[in-house]
From Swiss-Prot:
Organism name: Methanothermobacter thermautotrophicus (strain ATCC 29096 / DSM 1053 / JCM 10044 / NBRC 100330 / Delta H) (Methanobacterium thermoautotrophicum)
Keyword Nucleotidyltransferase: no
Keyword Cytoplasm: yes
Protein name as catalogued: Nucleoside diphosphate kinase
Gene that specifies this protein: ndk
Family: Belongs to the NDK family.
Length: 150
């Protein structure tokens, strides 16, 4: 099964949206296999967002993501990276469809609630940044055969 890294950003935590967002993933049959709340240190934030280092918004992004706790998760499921990206919606909430997480909850681009891996390579890199292998739990869902065709 494919794994994706998902992070609920400070605005999601401060606005008490975590439970509602997590329920959406579970309602779609996805499985949370790692979960933690943390205050991201600046060096980890800079490494996580390294692809934006030369962009003008980089410093604001680092300041924002380190301003309050986040919830980091590893979510597992069949083709979960593309499914989660569809569920998350467009980066700019004004362009995100209603029914997506950002379309329903996010208010502006700089405070857009959630981060999700955009590729298997990104997922692998991001998971390793936030979780040790021992923190990722494998388990069988009793309703698996109701969710996935074999």
């Amino acid at each position: 099964m494919e794994k994706s890294f998902v992070m609920l950003k400070p605005d999601a935590v401060k606005r008490r949206l975590a439970g509602r967002i997590i329920a959406r993933f579970e309602d779609r049959g996805l499985k949370i296999v790692a979960f933690k709340m943390l205050q991201i240190p600046e060096d980890l934030a800079m490494e996580h967002y390294q692809e934006h280092r030369e962009k003008p918004f980089f410093r604001d992004l680092v300041d924002y993501i380190t301003s309050a706790p986040v919830i980091a998760m590893v979510i597992e499921g069949k083709d979960c990276i593309s499914l989660i990206r569809k569920m998350v919606g467009a980066t700019n909430p004004a362009e995100a469809d209603l029914g997506t997480i950002r379309g329903d909850f996010a208010l502006e681009t700089g405070r857009n609630i959630i981060h999700a891996s955009d590729s298997p390579e990104s997922a692998e890199r991001e998971i390793k940044l936030f979780f040790d292998e021992s923190e990722i739990c494998s388990y069988e869902m009793p309703d698996r055969e109701m969710i996935y065709e074999e």
